[in-house]
């Protein structure tokens, strides 16, 4: 039986539409995108990866890399909402960080419980098969609404029972890319999938303030590519003067140190300058 294949991406993979479309001939039909980590990090590629994965497959989910605590659930949910992802979206908790406690199950349930209480019921837990086998994640005591996304490489089976998604490789088609078999077709476009909200941009000249954790300056438009990034970075609360310039349908801010995003999810206009 041929199972649906989904990929999971982070800042290490491309965020272009051509990247996601290029995977379709290999049977890829969905994507899980890393959105956040801890309480300070949001993937700089998440917005584009979410939008372009949805364009390519008609469905997309997101995950949070966990370091423990329900305060991370609050942070994750805030980012989910800012991305415009509705309550049909699959949200996953990535449980693999080396700083996690030896027993994680109670904390996992609290994290998922917070999301569930806020109306997000399509939830899953990601972890290595060894964490389940060793009891670090107690499968029997996980919240009943949590689906299982299990990683096990170099084997013919996931290694535990009742798995919903099996991440079977981190080198899909020779690329540095994780891929999974979606046994239950959880990420399947059915016309009811979430539709990311189109980003809104500032179009004015003025004083701006960074509202997210970190944004990068770029040498030129469009704001893409690691080679195009400058070493200049702005952290939350930083202020700068910028002039809005348009590249296609996207506005950016031209500054003395390069080009910055004009996306309203990342910056606030403090004062318009005529």
Regions found by a protein language model. Give the residues of each.
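Aromatic-lined carbohydrate-recognition surfaces of secreted/lumenal glycan-active proteins
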Residues: 120-133
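Short beta-strand/turn micro-motifs composed of small residues
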Residues: 64, 127, 152
């Amino acid at each position: 039986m041929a199972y649906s294949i989904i990929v999971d991406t982070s800042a290490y993979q491309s965020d272009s539409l051509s990247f996601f479309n290029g995977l379709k001939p290999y049977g890829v039909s969905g994507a899980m995108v890393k959105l956040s980590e801890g309480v300070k990090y949001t993937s700089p590629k998440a917005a584009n990866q979410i939008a372009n994965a949805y364009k390519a497959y008609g469905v997309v989910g997101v995950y949070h890399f966990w370091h423990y605590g329900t305060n991370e659930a609050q942070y994750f949910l805030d980012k989910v909402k800012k991305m415009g992802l509705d309550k049909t979206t699959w949200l996953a908790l990535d449980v693999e960080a080396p700083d996690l406690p030896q027993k994680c199950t109670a904390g996992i349930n609290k994290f998922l419980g917070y999301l569930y209480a806020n109306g997000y019921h399509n939830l899953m837990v990601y972890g290595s098969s060894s964490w389940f086998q060793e009891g670090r994640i107690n499968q029997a005591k996980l919240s009943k609404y949590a689906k299982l996304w299990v990683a096990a490489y170099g084997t013919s089976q996931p290694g535990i029972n009742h798995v919903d998604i099996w991440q079977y490789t981190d080198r899909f088609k020779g690329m540095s890319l994780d891929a999974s078999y979606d046994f239950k077709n959880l990420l399947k476009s059915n016309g009811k999938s979430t539709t990311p909200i189109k980003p809104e941009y500032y179009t004015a000249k003025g004083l701006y303030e960074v509202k997210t954790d970190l944004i990068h300056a770029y040498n030129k438009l469009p704001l893409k590519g690691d080679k195009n990034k400058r070493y200049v970075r702005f952290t939350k609360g930083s202020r700068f003067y910028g002039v809005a310039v348009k590249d296609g349908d996207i506005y950016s801010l031209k500054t003395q140190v390069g080009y910055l995003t004009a996306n309203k999810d990342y910056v606030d206009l403090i004062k318009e300058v005529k």
